[in-house]
Amino acid sequence: MSYQMPQNRTMSHNPYNSSDMPMPSAKEQTLMWQQNSYLGDSGIHSGAVTQVPSLSGKDDDMEDDPLMFDMDQGFSQNFTQDQVDDMNQQLSQTRSQRVRAAMFPETLEEGIEIPSTQFDPQQPTAVQRLSEPSQMLKHAVVNLINYQDDADLATRAIPELIKLLNDEDQVVVSQAAMMVHQLSKKEASRHAIMNSPQMVAALVRALSQSNDLETTKGAVGTLHNLSHHRQGLLAIFKSGGIPALVKLLSSPVESVLFYAITTLHNLLLHQDGSKMAVRLAGGLQKMVALLQRNNVKFLAIVTDCLQILAYGNQESKLIILASTGPSELVRIMRSYDYEKLLWTTSRVLKVLSVCSSNKPAIVEAGGMQALAMHLGNPSQRLVQNCLWTLRNLSDAATKVDGLETLLSGLVTVLGSSDVNVVTCAAGILSNLTCNNQRNKVTVCQVGGVEALVGTIINAGDREEITEPAVCALRHLTSRHPESESAQNIVRNGYGLPVIVKLLNPPSRWPLIKAVIGLIRNLALCPSNAAPLREHGAIHLLVRLLFKAFQDTQRQRSSVATNGSQPPGAYADGVRMEEIVEGTVGALHILSKEELNRQLIRQQNVISIFVQLLFYNDIENIQRVAAGVLCELAVDKEVAEMIEAEGATAPLTELLNSANEGVATYAAAVLFKMSEDKSMDYKKRFSSELTTLPVFRDDTMWNNGELGIGPDLQDILSPDQAYEGLYGQGPPSVHSSHGGRAFQQGYDTLPIDSMQGLEIGGGGNAGPAGSNPNAGNNPGAGGPPSGQPTSPYAMDMDVGEMDASELTFDHLDVMPSPPQDNNQVAAWYDTDL
């Protein structure tokens, strides 16, 4: 399946294959040729008149051939020569009458019968065919005469009608308005009216001042007729007709309302300056009030006016919001099936959905569910508008429940061949599966993982599709009850080679970043470790790590030299530190498998891991670096290589880190490096650990048996919604790229809000906020107010032990990393 525009297909017009038919003889061909219509022509082509033997090929015996036509066979009645002569004479005498009847039938006297020469009613005679142009000319002349008469009449009547419209007697004004309305129905007089500014001004004045219904209907009907011409629109606008028309939007009379709204609609579409005039006259408020009516065609015009007024104008959007417009628009989407009304309404919602104030109002009014009702509509323009609107709303609907129908519909439309439809559907799924376990489970249960894998395979190099689809898969492969199943489905659906391939050029950095996070999640499934290695994931991750590390080193050197951050800190809105952190985190998970560890060791990256320990200003990078070293140090040779790279000093310093995860990983690596050291060294090391703040808690260790706990990378943290780099609409509030300042562990400024944190552990996380401290933070799971904002608050299930008795004398395993994280963690650990 490919996403391409439909192409025209050529079809053969030959209903049979001529090669299958026997070739007739030359004589038969000649006979068949002569049976065609050529015998009825002038003889130029067929030779039927001249019949020169050398040209026609007519033999003497052809007259007796039964295949030849009998020219008289169609006439069953025999006429005598006298009868024929009488008919010819009659036709000759009535020729002029026949011509007159065809061209000027109104000149004939009644009762005269004229013989007809028409044998076939389906075939007009030559005279009849020749009469058509003359009839058209006659009608044109008549119309021209009438047009001139209408124009002359209107021109002479306009001055008098203006006086009557300005009369104090309302009865006179009413009669004059109705008369002008009748004149405006004819084109000539209509042009005369619109070319008279005084007449248009008089109509507007009568409209504004009169309370008489007939006057109002006549005047507004005239303005409606004028509004079909640009000159008429300009005349209405210059005469101040817009405030008068807006006032009529409160009329209880249907015909007046229709005239007023259609005239305003024409003005908004074609007359410059009319939008501002309608806004100033309070038209928006009145139009929103009209949404409560139930005439679908009327509502279609009203909603189209609202779309024109709101597009690109924030003030108009806020006025619609203040007038409870979003709820009325959602009601229309839920209540009607008239395609044009649904389309125009979805256009208004699409415009409003990019407004940060209207967005939550639409979501709260049930906009997501109402728009989902029309994803199966046969109208493609309606479906696309609904999808774009849902895409814009989706980052504000990550906490909304009851979206099962929408999610199922989105999975279905992923199978569309329309690029825009698939792009929107993937982006919406990415946002709605962000930080919402229920939505994740729903999408998995309706076949969303398989559909997304198929979408990525079919998309090829279309990043506008692959990026949101990869982000959605990243969400579905971690931190919910069905995540392990999703990880297996990706492998079984042949998605691994395609996903790994996306790490290669020409993929841009936002897509690469998303793929790194997805690979990290897929590696959580032990069954994926070997296939990922075989498809080259480790080589590609290491290559990206080298590139990103070089860029960050160059940047940091420039900062140290110049004291300012260079422009190259971002690439396509993604900081290279994010790539460093993500690749190291993915390698950490992959290194749990022995063959993967051996391959990583062969990539000459241990020195980079050690250098990353010095990134004191980026705690998350220190954590992932210590984490991967912790896994690699399981092999004694690698532990020696780590020590040879000078890791002892930075690891010792990291023991003092306020980040429990960093400190624990550092302790684990140091412990592994000390395995071949003397017992005195181990005791001294153990004693030093107990003096550190992070290790003073006597519940840190489990009676001397310190088994490796759940991987620290499985610790949960905030989801972050996908912001489509290629889509329309506002940036997602959860965006991690697109030029915004990165705020996950890289900025020196503190994070102001913990909103949106989803806390738990491992691929099968429990519900967010299960931590006892969750009540101190509405984002679920944040630290109590006043405590340090360390990314790793631990919640370990360990036995009791006095810290003074802590010793490494008989330990053959490393310290256990923390098992929970209730604070900000690395982006790749999340649904970023």
Curated annotation (Swiss-Prot):
Secretion signal, residue range per the UniProt entry: none
Principal subcellular localisation of the protein: cytoplasm
Subcellular location: Cytoplasm; Cell membrane; Cell junction, Adherens junction
Keywords from the UniProt entry: Cell adhesion, Cell junction, Cell membrane, Cytoplasm, Developmental protein, Membrane, Repeat, Segmentation polarity protein, Wnt signaling pathway
A cellular-component GO term for this protein: adherens junction
CDD domains: CTNNAbd_dArm
GO MF entries: cadherin binding
InterPro entries tied to this protein: ARM-like, ARM-type_fold, Armadillo, Beta-catenin
Gene Ontology biological process: canonical Wnt signaling pathway; cell adhesion; neuroblast fate commitment; segment polarity determination
Record's bilayer topology term: Peripheral membrane protein
Family stated for the protein in its record: Belongs to the beta-catenin family.
Function per UniProt: May associate with CadN and participate in the transmission of developmental information. Can associate with alpha-catenin. Accumulates through wg signaling; arm function in wg signal transduction is required early in development for determination of neuroblast fate. Arm and Abl proteins function cooperatively at adherens junctions in both the CNS and epidermis.
Protein name as annotated: Armadillo segment polarity protein
Record organism: Aedes aegypti (Yellowfever mosquito)
Source taxonomy: Eukaryota, Metazoa, Ecdysozoa, Arthropoda, Hexapoda
Gene name, Swiss-Prot/TrEMBL: arm
